[in-house]
Curated annotation (Swiss-Prot):
It comes from Streptococcus thermophilus (strain ATCC BAA-491 / LMD-9). SUPFAM superfamilies: Proton glutamate symport protein. The keyword Zinc does not apply. This is Serine/threonine transporter SstT. The gene is sstT. The lineage of its organism: Bacteria, Bacillati, Bacillota, Bacilli, Lactobacillales. PANTHER family: PROTON/GLUTAMATE-ASPARTATE SYMPORTER, SERINE_THREONINE TRANSPORTER SSTT. It is found in: Cell membrane.
Amino acid sequence: MKRFISAWNRTSLIKRIAIGVVIGAILGLLIPKITVIGLLGDMFVGGLKAIAPLLVSALVANALSQTREGQQSNMKTVIVLYLFGTFAAALTAVISHYIFPISLKLGAASATKAAAPQGIGEVFKDLMLKMVDNPINALSQANYIGVLVWAVVFGFAMRTASEHTKELLHTLAEVTSQIVRWIINLAPFGILGLVFDTISKNGVGVLADYGVLILVLVGTMTFVALVINPIIAFVMMGKNPFPLVFRCLKDSGITAFFTRSSAANIPVNLQLCEDLGLNPDTYLVSIPLGSTINMAGAAVTINVLTLAAVTTLGIEVDFATAFILSVVSTISACGASGIAGGSLLLVPVACSLFGISNDLAMQVVGVGFIVGVIQDSCETALNSSTDVLFTAVAEKSRWKKS
């Protein structure tokens, strides 16, 4: 047993996760009724979600409390990259619609009872209210906008505190980071449970009826990850971006694919940024912020599903209108939050541009939930890996200039 544990610990985390994926799929096909196996996945995601708000709060406050006047970060560049990357992804989805137009079986889709935003104004209102949420409530409800805002406020306020107080905050950040490392080391078992749960509940053939929609969604997201993002990175860095792109997809995207939550993947991304040697003054803020506003995958989902509904209803859409849709979906995607399935509930906002009733729009959302097993996983992988990619690109572009 000791030899096995020793060999297991020497194996890289990615290989251990791959083993967990294979075992989870096999168990899901052979013994789907042993649902207790899926509890491993629920506990893993629950653990990440539980510690992530505290981690963000502690690390951001600690980082800002240690900064001095004149220190530089790349936050302005990172935010511009986040917004431009999301818009580029939305525009890519529009182009894919013209190349591969698809329609939906709206009558067969089950409507969801979840409440969707009534417009872009409501999305902005929610974001503003999240900023001034009670800090304790923000931590307990994983409101990352609120957590981030209050962490920044406390961090700046503590810049004038005594060194003893700053050291206490630094210790809290270190302890929280260690707990996160322990949880991440359990990823192979957690992902085993997540894969088992997906296969045992849905089987491998449940998505056959929606194969074309899945192909367009996944194909567009793949194009963004392997073509659009590398182009942006190359323009900014002036060198081959693919080693960095593949590193982000491997170390961040794979984990995010199975957790289906950008929020739960924050600890993984923070560790990757540290491994890449990035400036903590930047990434301790940009990563949790990215889990909320950097939503390239969400923009793709919103545009593809909305334009599929438009095609189904026979509504003619010129490119100028589709361009406006890209702007709307970019803004709306910023409110998707880092929660599994969040982008689907913003589809009615985009559908409203074309006069599509809320009832029909919610049927489109129902289709989204049907294909969500794959769509949401790919969307989260793109969103989360891009958080690290653009943070690294912003810093490396500054290195090029200096």
